[in-house]
Curated annotation (Swiss-Prot):
<dbReference type="InterPro" id="IPR039398">
    <property type="entry name" value="Deltex_fam"/>
</dbReference>
<feature type="region of interest" description="Disordered">
    <location>
        <begin position="216"/>
        <end position="316"/>
    </location>
</feature>
<keyword id="KW-0677">Repeat</keyword>
<feature type="compositionally biased region" description="Low complexity">
    <location>
        <begin position="486"/>
        <end position="506"/>
    </location>
</feature>
<dbReference type="GO" id="GO:0090090">
    <property type="term" value="P:negative regulation of canonical Wnt signaling pathway"/>
</dbReference>
<dbReference type="GO" id="GO:0005737">
    <property type="term" value="C:cytoplasm"/>
</dbReference>
<dbReference type="GO" id="GO:0090263">
    <property type="term" value="P:positive regulation of canonical Wnt signaling pathway"/>
</dbReference>
<dbReference type="InterPro" id="IPR004170">
    <property type="entry name" value="WWE_dom"/>
</dbReference>
<keyword id="KW-0862">Zinc</keyword>
<dbReference type="InterPro" id="IPR001841">
    <property type="entry name" value="Znf_RING"/>
</dbReference>
<keyword id="KW-0963">Cytoplasm</keyword>
<dbReference type="Pfam" id="PF18102">
    <property type="entry name" value="DTC"/>
</dbReference>
<feature type="compositionally biased region" description="Polar residues">
    <location>
        <begin position="216"/>
        <end position="233"/>
    </location>
</feature>
<dbReference type="GO" id="GO:0016567">
    <property type="term" value="P:protein ubiquitination"/>
</dbReference>
<dbReference type="GO" id="GO:0005654">
    <property type="term" value="C:nucleoplasm"/>
</dbReference>
<dbReference type="InterPro" id="IPR039399">
    <property type="entry name" value="Deltex_C_sf"/>
</dbReference>
<dbReference type="GO" id="GO:0005771">
    <property type="term" value="C:multivesicular body"/>
</dbReference>
Length: 738
C-alpha cells in the first residue's frame, strides 16, 4: 500500500479487482455509515477501509485502516492519511461524506475526489490473518510494482490456496472475472489469450478487529451461510451495502458478472438439450430391449432354480435412482453440463418408473434393470462430457459389471483423483507448536488455529504444510452413494468402518493429550527455541478468574484455544491471542521468532531491534569508580553516525541525527561487571540498545536515543549499589540470557 491513493488518482487498472463500484456482484461484507460510531457487541469482525479506483474497490494498508478506524470511533470529520502513511501526504478522508480528497488543487480542475467505504470481514479472512495477495503491474518476470487485489478476490484466492488447488478459474466463481490463477508458478493469465503476470502472497499486519451490533452479527452469519452453500468459496463474510460513492468521470466497461455468465450458460444448455432429445429417445429404446432380455433370463432362471422371497435391501426406489444419477456429475469435465445432467437424470428416472412398477415382484430383475439403467446413464453422461466419443453400447452383462465396479470404487477413486491432483498446500513458512486432533481440524474450518502460533510466512514457497485429511475433502465434494450390497458384504463394511473410527478416536485422544499436557513442542529448531517458554495451564476459576490481557475475554480452558502462561513472568493469555501478537510483530527484515509479554514487556527469544549501524568497543583503565575501590574500570565506547532511515525506522527516507556520539560509559571491572559487559555486547549485536525517535532532553525528532537499558556516562554517577543488578534485569527483560 505504498501508493494506494496515488494509484486511485492516476486511474490504474486493477485486474481481478472485484465487482465495479456501481454493481458489486455477490459481495460478502458489511458497510457502515460514515458518521456512526463503532459497533458494540460480543461478535467480532475485521474492519477494512477501502477506496475507489476506476470503478473497483481496493483496500488501504492496515496502518491507514487503523488510523481511519480510530478517527471514525472519535467521530472526526477530516483525517490526514500522511499521519499513517507518509506517501499519502496530499490526501485526506472526509469521514462524514466517506470521500478521499486531495489538497493538491490545480487551476480549473478542482479537488480530486474518490469514494471511500468501511467494510467488515471475518477474522479468518486474509485481512484478519495478516496475509495479502498482490499482482505485478509489469510482466511475469518483473518483481516490482506490486498491486493488491480486491479484498473479495483475495478471499477467494486464499480459499483455493488453502485447499491446495493447482489452478483457480475466476470465471467459475461468483465474481465472474476472466482470469486464471496458477498456484504452481504463481502467475495470473487473462482469458482467453491475455497477458501473463506474476502474483505473490505476502505477510502484513492484521487489520483492526471491531465488535459488531447484534443486527450486523446476524446478517454476517446468515449471509455467510447463504454464500457458502451457493458458491462453495470462502464464506464468513457479510452482505455488501455501499452507502456513499462519488461518481467517477472515467470508468472502464464493467466485467461480466456471475449473473450474466449464468444467463449465457443457460442459453447454451437449452440448445444442447434440444440436440440431446433424439439421443435420449435412442437410450430409452435400448433400455426396453435390455429389460426384455433380463425378463427372459429371469424366467429361465426361475424355471430351473427354487423361488426365493424378495429382499428389501436390494430394492431401489425411483428417488434413490434419481439421487444416484444426479450425483454422477463428479465425472463431468466442465461445470457447464451440470444442468444437462440434472435434466437427463430426471428423464431417465421418470422413464424407468413404469418398468420398475411392472417388475416390482421380481427382485432380481428389478435389481438388474436398475444397474442397467445406471450404466446407460453413465455412458450417456460420458458421451456428453468427455472430449472423444465412447464406443458403441456394450451388452447388458458387461454394462452391469462396469456399473457395479464403478459404483463400489467411486468413493476411493474420487478421493484418489483429488489427492493426486492436489499439490502440497504451500502456506509459505508455517510452523506448529502442538499436534492437533482431527476433530479440531475439521471443526475450525477457516478459523485461526492453535497451530498458527509460529506462522511467520514472508512470501516464501520453500516449506510445505501437511495437506487436509480426506475427511475434510469429502465434506466439500460428496461422492455418490453405492448400490445395495450383499448382507455379508454390508456386515464386513460396517465392521471395517467401526474399526477405522475406533482407531481415529484413539489417535485423536492421544494427540489431544500430547497437545495439552506439559510444554508445547515444535517441529523445527526455531519453534523449539520459542515454545519452551510457553506452557498450557488450567486458568483459575471464579472468584480468582482473570481475563486475557489482549482480548479481555474470560480465560476458559479449551482444546481449540487453551490458556497458556509464560515461563518467567507467569502471565496468562489465550494461545490464539499470542499467535496474533507474534504475527503482528513479524517484520520482513526480521525472521527471528520472539514473544514479548503484553503485560510486563519481557522478551522470550531473540528479538532484533532497529538500532542504526554503529560500533561498540571497550577497554580497561586503571581508575577506580566511587564505591568500587581497588577495582579497575571498564570503559565502553558507542559510535553511531548520522544517515538515512530505512523501512524499519519510523520515517523511511528521512535523515536521522546521531547527537552526542561517540558516547562513553563505565562499568566496574568485577565478575558481575564483566557479565553485564557480555550481555551489553549481545544486546548491541541484536540492535536493542539504541533506536530512532524523539529526544527526551531536546524534544527533537529523528535522533538516536537510548532504549530501556541504563548506562553510566559520568564518574560522579557512582556509587550505585543496585546498578549492576538492575542492568542485568533490564537486559534479561530484552531476552538477553545465557
Amino acid at each position: 500500500m505504498a501508493s494506494s491513493a496515488g494509484s486511485a488518482a492516476s486511474g490504474s487498472v486493477v485486474p481481478g479487482g472485484g465487482g465495479s463500484a456501481a454493481s458489486s456482484c455477490a459481495t460478502m461484507a458489511l458497510s457502515t455509515a460514515g458518521s456512526g460510531g463503532p459497533p458494540v457487541n460480543h461478535a467480532h469482525a475485521v474492519c477494512v477501509w477501502e477506496f475507489e479506483s476506476r470503478g473497483k474497490w481496493l483496500p488501504y494498508s492496515p496502518a491507514v485502516s487503523q488510523h481511519l478506524e480510530r478517527a471514525h470511533a472519535k467521530k472526526l470529520t477530516r483525517v490526514m492519511l500522511s499521519d499513517a502513511d507518509p506517501s499519502l501526504e496530499q490526501y485526506y478522508v472526509n469521514v462524514r461524506t466517506m470521500t478521499q480528497e486531495s489538497e493538491a488543487e490545480t487551476a480549473g480542475s478542482g479537488l480530486l475526489t474518490i469514494g471511500v467505504r468501511r467494510m467488515f470481514y471475518a477474522p479468518s479472512s486474509p485481512a484478519g490473518k495478516g496475509t495479502k495477495w498482490e499482482w505485478s503491474g509489469g510482466s511475469a518476470d518483473s518483481n516490482n510494482d506490486w498491486r493488491p487485489y480486491n479484498m473479495h478476490v483475495q478471499c477467494i484466492i486464499e480459499d483455493a490456496w488453502a485447499r491446495g488447488e493447482q489452478t483457480l478459474d475466476l470465471c467459475n466463481t461468483h465474481i465472474g472475472l476472466p482470469y486464471t490463477i496458477n498456484f504452481c508458478n504463481l502467475t495470473q493469465l487473462r482469458q482467453p489469450s491475455g497477458p501473463m503476470r506474476s502474483i505473490r502472497r505476502t505477510q502484513q499486519a492484521p487489520y483492526p478487529l471491531v465488535k459488531l451490533t447484534p443486527q450486523q452479527a446476524n446478517q454476517l452469519k446468515s449471509n455467510s451461510a447463504s454464500v457458502s452453500s451457493q458458491y462453495n468459496t470462502l464464506p464468513k463474510l457479510g452482505d455488501t451495502k455501499s452507502l456513499h460513492r462519488v461518481p467517477m468521470t472515467r470508468q472502464q466497461h464493467p466485467l461480466p458478472t456471475s449473473h450474466q455468465v449464468q444467463q449465457q450458460q443457460h442459453q447454451h444448455q437449452h440448445q444442447q438439450q434440444q440436440q440431446q432429445q433424439h439421443h435420449h429417445q435412442h437410450q430409452q429404446q435400448q433400455h426396453q430391449q435390455q429389460q426384455q432380455h433380463q425378463m427372459q433370463h429371469h424366467q429361465i432362471h426361475h424355471q430351473t432354480a427354487p423361488r426365493k422371497p424378495p429382499k428389501k435391501h436390494s430394492e431401489i426406489s425411483t428417488t434413490n435412482l434419481r439421487q444416484i444419477l444426479n450425483n454422477l456429475n463428479i465425472f463431468s469435465s466442465s461445470t457447464k453440463h451440470q444442468s444437462n445432467m440434472s435434466t437427463a437424470a430426471s428423464a431417465s428416472s421418470s422413464s424407468s418408473s413404469a418398468s420398475l412398477h411392472h417388475a416390482n415382484h421380481l427382485s432380481h430383475a428389478h435389481f438388474s434393470h436398475a444397474k442397467n439403467m445406471l450404466t446407460a446413464s453413465m455412458n450417456s453422461h460420458h458421451s456428453r462430457c468427455s472430449e472423444g466419443s465412447l464406443q458403441s453400447q456394450r451388452s447388458s452383462r458387461m454394462g452391469s459389471h462396469r456399473s457395479r465396479s464403478r459404483t463400489r470404487t467411486s468413493d476411493t477413486d474420487t478421493n484418489s483423483v483429488k489427492s493426486h491432483r492436489r499439490r502440497p498446500s504451500v502456506d509459505t513458512v508455517s510452523t506448529y507448536l502442538s499436534h492437533e486432533s482431527k476433530e479440531s481440524l475439521r471443526s475450525r474450518n477457516f478459523a485461526i488455529s492453535v497451530n498458527d502460533l509460529l506462522d511467520c510466512s514472508l512470501g516464501s514457497d520453500e516449506v510445505f504444510v501437511p495437506s487436509l485429511p480426506p475427511s475434510s475433502l469429502g465434506e466439500r465434494a460428496p461422492v455418490p452413494p453405492p448400490l445395495p450390497l450383499h448382507p455379508r458384504q454390508q456386515q464386513q463394511q460396517q465392521q471395517q468402518q467401526q474399526q477405522l473410527q475406533m482407531q481415529q478416536q484413539q489417535q485423536a485422544q492421544q494427540q489431544q493429550q500430547q497437545s495439552i499436557a506439559g510444554s508445547i513442542v515444535g517441529v523445527d529448531p526455531a519453534s523449539d527455541m520459542i515454545s519452551r517458554f510457553v506452557k498450557v495451564v488450567e486458568p483459575p476459576l471464579w472468584p480468582n478468574a482473570q481475563p486475557c490481557p489482549m482480548c479481555m475475554e474470560e480465560l476458559v480452558h479449551s482444546a481449540q484455544n487453551p490458556a497458556i502462561s509464560l515461563s518467567r513472568c507467569q502471565h496468562l493469555m489465550h494461545l490464539q491471542c499470542l499467535n496474533g501478537m507474534i504475527i503482528a510483530q513479524q517484520n520482513e527484515m526480521n525472521k527471528n521468532l520472539f514473544i514479548e509479554c503484553p503485560v510486563c514487556g519481557i522478551v522470550y527469544g531473540e528479538k532484533v531491534g532497529n538500532q542504526p549501524i554503529g560500533s561498540m568497543s571497550w577497554s580497561i583503565i586503571s581508575k577506580n569508580l566511587p564505591g568500587h575501590e581497588g577495582q579497575n574500570t571498564i570503559q565502553i565506547v558507542y559510535d553511531i553516525a548520522s544517515g538515512l532511515q530505512t523501512e524499519e525506522h519510523p520515517h523511511p527516507g528521512r535523515a536521522f541525527f546521531a547527537v552526542g556520539f561517540p558516547r562513553i560509559c563505565y562499568l566496574p571491572d568485577c565478575p558481575l561487571g564483566r557479565k553485564v559487559l557480555r550481555f551489553l555486547k549481545i544486546a548491541f549485536d541484536r540492535r536493542l540498545l539504541f533506536s530512532i525517535g524523539r529526544s527526551v532532553t531536546t524534544g527533537r525528532e529523528d535522533v538516536v536515543i537510548w532504549n530501556s537499558v541504563d548506562h553510566k556516562t559520568q564518574f560522579n554517577m557512582f556509587p550505585d549499589p543496585t546498578y549492576l543488578q538492575r542492568t542485568m534485569q533490564q537486559l534479561v527483560h530484552l531476552g538477553v540470557t545465557d
